[in-house]
Every structure is written in structure tokens, then in C-alpha cells.
């Protein structure tokens, strides 16, 4: 479009000079970073408009750095240097700053200067989508003090207690921290400074053994991943919270109070490692869920079907959700046969001895079981659910099962005459994205790998 406008009339007039600057700025704002930079050479009017046009900087839209032109510069710093030049050449606002393939290696001080600059220039989205280890512990404190910021996603950065206590991101609605270093006190301060927060994603944040989310009255989605040493998750006074996702291990004390809209929880991981980074698990850590959560309608569990201890935990977990309607159970059994410890093996009459569970008797309508390989123990658990779930409408099993095995399951006793059995082969799961999960009424009813995020 810009190239067409630049074509002179038959009289040699510059048609671009006739256009208002607001229109030129609008044209530039609709182009990618590289295209906009190339367009400004067409006319001095475009160059003038460029200076006042908001810069949407996405490194996927930048040309690949030329190799070999400057031998003294390491190749991994070339893209970071291009980012520095782009910010320096454009004095206007920078509403979008998104990095997917830029490493801070050798340029940490430059990255920290970017963060200060972005906070001062009205950034609305700052997303470091590159590999977390590429961020090299850059300090990101200034971003939490940005009053214009709406979306913040950090990789392996640092947030100091002083920076977190100065958080004043009044418009921030989405915060993602991946392998970021932050203290428990710093997390509390950061949350207090983000009153509009709707989504909080914590992935392997260093320095935290207790996650406490209190008085986050706008929070809708909380994600917690990869915390083998996590001792406690506490959610209090979160009236809008609807989903708690991640791989939440039962070795943590889980307390949820004041979250009346919480309807989806998972994955709750029943298989508990008995060591933490080579050390014996501290006494009293295996605490699990503290009190019933009646609002939850959708629950996802990760379990080893072949282990009696795991199944006891999984069944006891069901008792905390008296109004559960949909249950997802994903196997974490190895793909190879393991000789079971006879003291921890599922015996033939194990499920017959289980006491009645309220949600199975009255409310459970949908069950989805998944296992990457044939697992006899999973079939026994499926038979248990079919025999106990009186209002079951639908059960889907994703596994490699023979026709004979499917027929045996169909012939098992079913407490619900309306129950429908569906068998599927195992499907590859896609990488986790917020967009994919929030688009589903049931966040576990899709091909997104929530457990492996």
C-alpha cells in the first residue's frame, strides 16, 4: 500500500505529501517492525510520521542478523544489538515488546536498560517468549512499576524484594513468571501492586516454597507448575477465581477458601516422589487437600494406576469434591512393565472394598481416562467407576486397547443405564497456550498438554 502511494503522478507530484500525518502513522502501525522500517525511506513525510508512531517490536519480524560482517561481535549478540538500535532510533511509545529468539547472553545490562526504557515509554505488553535460560537473570523490577503495562511474561529474570514492593502495575491483567527468581515476600508484594490481575502463571519460580494468593479479587486463572519442593498452596479471598491449573502435587498442603467460583482444578498429582533433590522428604510434608471444595465441577488427576498407594490417594481426593461432574485421570505409569511391590499392588478385590463416594453416587456424569499404553490396572479402575457412578453419561478411554479388551469393558456392570463408552487411540498433545485453554469450557477436554507445560 505504501509503495503504491509513493508512485508519482504523471506530473511528478509526491502523492504522499498530500496525506495527513495521522493516516501515514496509521499505515505504519499496521505494518510489521521490519516492513515499517523499510517504508519510511519512501518519503520524508513517512519518516516524520514514523517518529510519532507507536513501535510494536517483535523480533520474529526482524530480519536475521547478517553473519560475518562484524567478526569481532559474537553471533548471539547481534539480535540483541538490533533491538537496542531499534529502541534508540524510535523516540515514540512502545506498546508491544515481544522476544521469541533473542538471547541476553553478553547483553544483560542492555536488556535491563530495555526494561527501564519500556516502563518509561508506555509499554502495554512485554513478553519474553524465548527460552527462559536465554534471559540470564536480567533484573526486571522497572516493569512492575509501569502504570500502563497490561501483559507481562518473564523468563529467567530477577525480581528483587525492593522492586516487588514498588509494584504499581494498576492495569496489569496477565502475569507469567517462568524460572524467575523471586522470594515469597516479593510475590506477595507484586500481587498487591497488581489489583487488576486476572491471570497468574507460575512455572518453576525459584525461591518459593509456599505460594499464598490472598485478596486477589480479580484473579480468574491461577497456574502452578513444577514445584517438587512446594510445601503449601493457599488461596484466600479470590471471589473471581475459576481455574487452578498445573501439576499440583499432594505433598503440598492445599488450602482454598473464599473462592466460590472455582470450578476447574488439575492436574492433582497423586504420585509423590519421596526425595527432594536427593534429600529425604521432610516429615509432615505429605499433607494434601485440607478441606472439601464444593464448587469444583471439573477435576483432573495424574496417577499410577498400578500403585495401591497412588490409587488410595486418588480415591481419597474424590471425597473432597462432593459435587464433581467431570473427572479426567491421566496415567503416569511407565510404558514398560515394572514388577510391582506386593505390598503396593492392586489386588483383585481392592475396589470392591472401597466405601461409597458422594460425587460418584450423585453427580459424576463424564469421565475421561488416558494412558499411552495398555494398562490392566486402568481397566480395573474404569470398571470401578462404571459400577459406582449412578448418573454417568459418558466415559472416554484413550489407550491402545484390543477389541476384546473393549468388549470386556462394555460387558462389565454399569450402575447407569445411560452410560456411553467411547474408545480412542492416544493422540499427540500440543504445547500449552493460554489462548487454547481459556477457549474451552473444560480446560482438560482438548489436546493441550497441561501437565507438561
Identify the meaning behind each predicted range.
Residues 252-308, 320-323:
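Extended repeat-based solenoid scaffolds, especially LRR ectodomains
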